[in-house]
Amino acid sequence: MYILVWKEGQQIRTFQDLEECGQFQTASNITDGQIFSINVTPTMSKGGETGETQLRRLMYLSASTEPEKCNAEYLADMAHVATLRNKQIGVSGFLLYSSPFFFQVIEGTDEDLDFLFAKISADPRHERCIVLANGPCTGRMYGEWHMKDSHIDNITKHPAIKTILFQIARSFSSMWSYLPKNAANMLLLGKNPNKQAPEPMSVVVTFIYLVEFSSILAHPGLTEQCADILAAFVDACVRNVEGTGGQVAKFITGICMAYWPINRAEDALVGLQQLSEDLAELRSQQPPGSALSLIYSRCGVHYGRALLCNAGFRKADFTLLGDCINTASRITSLSVKLKVPLLLSFEVRCLLGDEMREELESSGLHKVKGRDKPVQVYQFNAPELDSAMVRAKIEQFNPGRYRALCPVKPYESLHPAQRPPIFDDTPRENQPKLSQVQRRDSLVDRLSLIAKLAFPSSMMAGGEGQLITLTYISQAAHPMSRLDLASIQRIAFARNESSNITGSLLYVSGLFVQTLEGPKGAVVSLYLKIRQDKRHKDVVAVFMAPIDERVYGSPLDMTSATEEMLATFPPLQDVLSQLAKSFISLETYVPSTVVRYLTAGNNPRNLQPVSVEVVMLATDICSFTPLSEKCSLTEVWTICNTFIDACTSAICNEGGEVIKLIGDCVTAYFPPTGADNAVHACQEIVSFCAQLRDAFHDVLDCRSVVACGVGLDFGQVIMAQCGSLGMTEFVVAGEVSARVMEVEALTREAGRAIVITEPVADRLSPKLRDTGIVPCQEGVDGVPCYGILGPEWELDVATIKKNIYGFHDARALAAMKKVDDGTNAPGRGAPAGGIPSSPKVRPPGRTNSVSSYTPDPNEALDPRMAESVFLDMCHQRGDTANNSIAVKLRQAANDDRLDLGRMLQGPHELMPVMQAIKHLTNLRMLNMSDNFVDDNNVGELVESCIPMRSLQVLDLSNNPGLTKVIALKRLIKHNTQVREILLNGTRIAPTEQRKLQSSMNVNRLCASTDLKGSHKYEH
């Protein structure tokens, strides 16, 4: 275990490995931290001294399919059979049943556990096995039990333990289908998604649009059927994406984001084509009046490097980040203009086989938003998909008497007890504002001010004297001694007695479980105080509901689970602790509305779809594409994490609800009466970015150029859950959802960091409306817009872009200076002519030419080193080496040919490959076709080819990023043996190709008079 200590010991965090610790320190820009390594020796029960190695412990939760049969005899029979089987394979563990859930822990070797858990998962006596913990252990904790069984009633009659086991397990099981697939897979492996380090990976990414969904939402006759449309769209996407080996990353208001591994590119396109066919079949089967006849999809596909990571803390999203995600979104938007159902980039085309390539048609080069260079796109020969046609069909649609399967009802028309808890009505006390220094110093600690519980609106309907029960869990900030617990009991007993509150407090190895009963006002007030108590952390409510009579008669029934209960069944402590930790982890990924509905004792599958008016918020980072293009994936993660934390903090503190985290974009909504709160949240977000820039002003940190725009709009949305049990989404969709993104984009043109529409302005308080807003010259969809007045709320996009490019240039110069300082150390010669010593780092504005490259006479080039150079560079960059390329390089060391055509997985592999092939001085033929070579990197490739004095053929076919021949001319000048450079499928003009060939012909004619030493590498 490793401990990171910073701020002179004021902040401490523990990590399981040194790499994770280092990544956190770098991402958090901690310069004064110290890392300590400590060894922890666990306490083990009998069986831990056997000297066994490579053991693993797995804990899971499942629901019984026949709970009525699960009595003590039933469990005893089950455990007897398991004991005989486990004894043979050397597995130990225990089984606990608390109706209707099973909790089981098994210990053994990897092979034994994999075999046993596969059989357990297929057992029909239970369902939905969810792994709570799965990891290596140094010894057996339950070595004396091959399978110990127990019914909860045989352990204790304590109601608090029964409550916590049932409520957490029920909530855990219900929330599972709402999790992002990546987070769910992490939990199945026994890993905490919140603790996982970012993982770079090569992916094929797509955005699937529900065509003209905003027009469907705007049609008054289709409001009732919107939930049906979304449900059908979600199911179709999940079925075709997961059926072809992909994963759905998220759903965003009629948009599905999904991805596939690099080796499933063809499967991805097949799945997307099948999705279009499935929706066509669905449309053809609909009766008159069904809105499902209006479902069309269009997709854009791109390939690149992305970062699979956990974004956010308070409200988290396990998702993909990276420039390729933005490009995939732009390509999908381009498909609207080109009227095609499926559009893919050149990078995706490079991954396809010859047979599928022949089916593609080039759609040309197109400029897309956020990118300086045009994008080459391709399409299949498919019928045209015109959005105007779909829009006209929607406008002419008449539902008639058709009734929706899941009708949407107006929120205000429902009885208060039936309304879903879509708004955060948590009573808020006056909370201290953080100073600028505090905010700058700690971006994580300030999240403690976020309300972690919002009470259901049905609970708020009753008076202050309504009798309620509330159960919460929390973790102790520090270990509790018997004296500490006695003090808590003494003080709490007197306080609860004066407030007419009864309940129980259970302490289990650092975990508090408390149930409070009493008048609603007193219980809520006490809970708010507990939430601020510094002795607690991670306070989460798991159950709250009205009651008719009390269960507890004492103001405080204090129980420590280290006495008779653990003497009867010691593993109970592990079950409670691990279950609570897993629940806390899940709660950050699940929509707050679902969590509130669960804590009120309801099944979230019964949430009523409603239509309601809200104030919608959207914000993202200005000029994020040019900022992220030259930043590492880890830096992109740092930027997004910092920004998301600030947004969720500001939104939740003002009573808003975070809807989605979409890369650098955050969307949220506020109640219709919360316009002022929404503006205050916007001001807090913009102020945070300004203070962040000031904090990193004097250092070369990517966060020193972060700025944002925020838009607010008002309108009606539909809130509904859709999807099957495999994946469920709580969707907030409406015409305002799309329009607010345009309002946010208007901040750049208006020069105001915060822009609101006229409906929002009408709902502001008189003081803010009359003195705090100024009209914008332009509106959105005919709706007038206003900017928040004040010099601190101005937004200068030109200055922001200038600062971003200046930051990149300054960092490049700093890197070059660092390299040159090492090169020009005493005893080494300085570079001549002011030329940078290292070709790896170029000053800004330098052209891609080999004219300024000077060979290093001391550089040792050995063909046998090519493979090791490639592997070393991949390791230094943190990438997984491509084994196929490594094998090719090894073979080329004893050959004169190297065929790497279409072998690179992405542009990130070009630099390691080019540094490796530089050592292959024996090559006569080099094939680099279909390998992401463009004008930016062809100079580096030519530099690598210059040492190949016998090179005759260079194949650069199907690299459309090539438009210039200047670097290739330099190659021909220095390597006169070159006979052919293949440029089919590039964008180099035919006239330039002919000139290049003429130069090679001249070299061939002059070959007989070639002078000794004419090659620059001959000495």
UniProtKB/Swiss-Prot annotation:
Residues 204-332, 615-744 form the Guanylate cyclase domain. Residues 846-855 have a biased composition (Polar residues). This is Photoactivated adenylate cyclase subunit alpha. Its cofactor is FAD. It holds the Pfam family Guanylate_cyc. It comes from the Eukaryota. Activity increased by up to 80-fold under blue light. The lineage of its organism: Eukaryota, Discoba, Euglenozoa, Euglenida, Spirocuta. Acts as a blue light photoreceptor for the step-up photophobic response. Mediates photoavoidance. It is an enzyme of class 4 (lyase). Its main location: other. It comes from Euglena gracilis. The gene is pacA.
